[in-house]
């Protein structure tokens, strides 16, 4: 991958390469659980990090607001802050570029380069592959998503999206409502104009690559977002672990995005391959529980 210049970029390249077979698929949750865990292991084993992978509790930032939260206030201990404000940004319009009904989302209070906190001088090297911009614009790198294309990290923090789609009530509804994995992950990924808690986190972060379906791991906050996705799934699993964290009843879906092109149903015997992130290929059945297979963790 010519544009990958670091181990961090290896993870982005992996996500770009597999995007259409890890979203709206039967392996969506297990793939991202393993991916986030591998990132944590790389930080610990290759970078000397002594902590654990934290999660972003969207329910809390929906109360405090994103820019005043400890996570995004731009302090030295944050995940950096907002981007430089771009005034009078129009709404985002999702779906129209792929022939789907339009979903209108408000723009945030930033939009430009991040100028505070640990990632203020960070370079995003890969993409864009499918970057949603205000006004219904979608852009791609004409040289392809894997070409070297260094640019600043941009954010457009949007508390309104956080409060509408990823608040405490929507989290609770996603845990208590669905009684099977198909309904659970469908609700999480969004139905119609409801973008779900998964989309709610991504689009409340905004920016480049935060609004890029393929390149979103290029913002380090991605891993905190997916830590919370994994936590919500884990809580739901604990309500019926025999059914929800074990066997064929724990997964649902096919091997391709919205089954396009048509593909076989995902099996617990299917393999999750982390590609450039360099993890050992694992069977889905070994990734269903956080206390078996390669994993040994629980959530608070």
Predicted regions and their residues:
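C-terminal accessory segments of proteins
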Residues: 1-300
């Amino acid at each position: 991958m010519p544009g990958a210049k670091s181990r961090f970029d290896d993870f982005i390249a992996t996500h770009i390469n597999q995007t259409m077979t890890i979203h709206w698929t039967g392996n969506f949750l297990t793939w991202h659980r393993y991916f986030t865990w591998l990132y944590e292991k790389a930080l610990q084993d290759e970078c000397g990090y002594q902590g654990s992978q934290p999660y972003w509790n969207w329910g809390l930032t929906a109360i405090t607001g994103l820019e005043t939260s400890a996570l995004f206030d731009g302090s030295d201990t944050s995940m950096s802050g907002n981007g430089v404000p771009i005034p009078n940004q129009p709404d985002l319009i999702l779906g129209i570029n792929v022939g789907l009904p339009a979903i209108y989302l408000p723009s945030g209070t930033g939009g430009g380069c991040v100028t505070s906190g640990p990632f203020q001088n960070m370079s995003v090297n890969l993409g864009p592959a499918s970057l949603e911009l205000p006004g219904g614009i979608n852009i791609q790198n004409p040289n392809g998503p894997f070409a070297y294309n260094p640019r600043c990290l941009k954010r457009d923090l949007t508390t309104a999206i956080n409060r509408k789609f990823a608040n405490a009530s929507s989290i609770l509804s996603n845990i208590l409502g669905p009684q099977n994995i198909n309904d659970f992950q469908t609700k999480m990924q969004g139905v119609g104009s409801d973008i779900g808690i998964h989309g709610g986190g991504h689009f409340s972060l905004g920016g480049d690559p935060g609004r890029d379906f393929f390149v979103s791991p290029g913002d380090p906050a991605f891993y905190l977002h997916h830590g919370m996705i994994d936590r919500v799934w884990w809580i739901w699993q604990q309500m019926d672990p025999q059914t929800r964290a074990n066997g064929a009843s724990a997964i649902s879906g096919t091997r391709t995005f919205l089954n396009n092109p048509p593909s076989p149903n995902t099996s617990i015997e299917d393999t999750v391959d982390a590609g450039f992130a360099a993890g050992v290929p694992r069977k889905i059945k070994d990734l269903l529980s956080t206390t078996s297979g390669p994993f040994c963790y629980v959530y608070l």
